[in-house]
Structure formats: structure tokens, C-alpha cells
């Protein structure tokens, strides 16, 4: 896919940027070159990425608290949000906001639901390739498979071990006018679970998501991935 998220309507991008998606947003989401320009493919799997993927292979589900800090470079304004995240690696993700209350992001099968500012939208990802790509990006980042995200979007990938954790950076080879120029994922060393995601937009907005009180292989609420009916 020659264009990495920069063709998504900015109204939807701003909703995902409120994620968390996120999270992380977790919710997903690196800008790429303009359409028609070549973008370097991701390199072969690094030892760090291989370790992250292997460690997450035994994860059946995740529940965590998350915080989001949106920083607008031009004004210096900062907007804080928070909520609860539910995830299973087979393609289910919910980011349920407590602040602002009522905001919601759900990926469930081929459905992608968002509620932002009281406006609800549900997409069929089997018919909407862009939203399908975005859903896959979010899911694969959380499940510890950033290489699949990089390969699917022709983004550059770099991985390293730092004092903070295992850090994977996805970077657009040439930033478009819209979308994300970079995503930085931090997986904690103890079990390679995603604990931080920084998403940098080409327009000067940065969203930082942090996962706290992470529980793995736990009992999730029966309605964790339910999409609200109209």
C-alpha cells in the first residue's frame, strides 16, 4: 500500500488520535510517501522484533488502563484522556474512555466502531480497505508484530534495546501532507508487552499513549468487544 494512512479522512484520523486509539492507539498509523513514490521496504526481522513476537505468542488477551496525552506543537496545548483497553490477538480491540466519558473504539471481526464527541460510526473493514488497514495496524502493534505493520505499509523499521524497554520505530520514508510520520512502540523487557506508543503526525500533533496495570490472560467482561446498537 503506497500511501500509509495519509489518505484517510482527517476526521477519522483525529478520532483515532484520540485513542488511543489509540492506542493505542492504540489504537495505529505511520504516514508514508505521497502516492506513486517508492518507499523502502522493512528489513528482515531483527533479534529484538523476533523476541517481542515470540513472547507475545502465548498471550491470549490483555486488559489494561491507558492514558493519552495529545500535544499540539503550534499552540503548546496538551489534552489528557484515559480509559480501559481490552484486547485479544485474533483481532478484537476495545478502548473504552472514562475521560472523556462515553468515547469508544471497538474492533470486532470485520467491524470497526468509533464514538467521538457523541458521533458514532461503524465501518465494515471487508469493504473499506483503509479502515481495515488501520484496524490491522492497531491490532498488530498491540500483539507485538510491528514487522507485519511495516511490511504491509512499506514503512521503515528500526528496533533496539534501551533502558526503557525494547523500542521499535516505524518511520515514513517520505512524509505525506497528512497522516503520521512516525510511530514509536515500547515493549517492556519483562514480558514484551506494549506499554507505550508515541504517534507523530505530520501536522505537528503528537499523541502519547501509555498502558498501565496490564493484565495478561485474564477474564475479560462478556461485553468487552460489543458494538453498541443504534
Ranges and model annotations:
Residues 1-12:
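N-terminal secretory signal peptides that target proteins for export/translocation
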Residues 17-26:
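Bacterial N-terminal signal peptides
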Residues 28-40:
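Boundary at the C-terminal end of the N-terminal hydrophobic targeting segment
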Residues 43, 48, 53-65, 70-72, ...:
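Flexible, processing/modification-adjacent segments and terminal tails
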Residues 66, 93-97, 112-115, 168-170, ...:
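Short hydrophobic/aromatic-rich beta-strand segments that constitute the beta-sheet cores
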Residues 80-82, 101, 108, 178-183, ...:
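Short, surface-exposed coil-to-beta transition loops
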Residues 84-136, 207:
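An acidic-aromatic
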Residues 148-230:
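Gly/Pro-enriched, hydrophobic low-complexity segments
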